[in-house]
Amino acid sequence: MEKTAQWQAQILTAKNSDWMRSNEYQSAIILYPVLKALNSKEADTLKTAMNYAWSLGEEVNTKLDILKESPKYNSEPPFDMAFRYAEPSDRMLKMTRKKFNLDKIAGKGDDISRIKNLLYRVHDNIEHDGSNGLAPGARNLENTYESARRNSCGYNCRALAICLTETLLAVGISARYITCIPKGWETDSDCHVICIAWSKSLNKWVWVDPTFAAYVTDENGIMLHPGEVRYRLQHDLPLILNEEANWNNRVKQTADYYLKEYMAKNLYFLETNIWNQAEPEGESNHPQGKTVTLVPVGLTYPHANYNTSNEKWFWQAPVIK
């Protein structure tokens, strides 16, 4: 055991060993407390090496470590603007509601069951293919669905999230799509796009991800929104991924990978559209909104129209008419 610690210390302090340092650091996290409990003389040496490796950069950090190190949010004065949600009486949403028979699909249950039914409908009818981008033409449910059928293909997470947002809005459920962005966005282009839907019964937003048919709950089965999931990841609080979560009905998802790896990486910055409607971006004949990104204090995301560190403002409730 002590020889193992000596080897790990050498790797953690060696030059040009980034490719090895990460694996050895994770092993050292397990070994160090054992050595400490045994009063081994190698415990302090290993701890010093771990601290040195940590100071060199993020190659030793897990994705969850990086999220936990994130600066906090604040209560800066909010923007003088409000999120907008298209009404189901909107011309395009009425067409969507009728064409896809959304009232029947949503069902007559409570709002949570309706949200889940629509989540599964989009997931089951438009496959995910991250390499295929968005459907050519209008960024709406009809065009994306018809294009996927016609070309026997899938589209990326953004396309699916835009479709689910439109589906929810069409039946009168306020919704937004959220682009989840990693800290290292300059070199890591792998973001993920999900939706949030407003639950009147819970009086809060809930996370719904059409790519993976996924939602997240606490230990009491209460659905959570991305901000709550982010906080719970940072503080090691219980998170439960629904059993049905999967990729294209072929690969089951687990909380360890989906939440603690994939989404832990992608919950560093959160971007959303101010105007939430059918065809919220891309080719469209109607005015479109600006984007705003929720950023930790002291950081900015330059691709957004606005940045804010006011978490309360970002997750504000929709005005229900």
Task: Please describe what each predicted stretch is.
Residues 40, 44, 106-110, 203-205:
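Structural helix-adjacent loops and short alpha-helical linkers that scaffold large soluble proteins
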Residues 54-155:
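Secondary-structure boundary elements
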Residues 116, 155-166:
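A structural signal for well-ordered alpha-helical segments within the folded catalytic domains
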Residues 153-157, 178-180:
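Short His-Asn-centered micro-motif
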Residues 162-238:
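Hydrophobic/aromatic-rich core segments of domains that either
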Residues 235-321:
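Low-complexity, Gly/Ser/Thr/Pro-rich intrinsically disordered linker/tail segments
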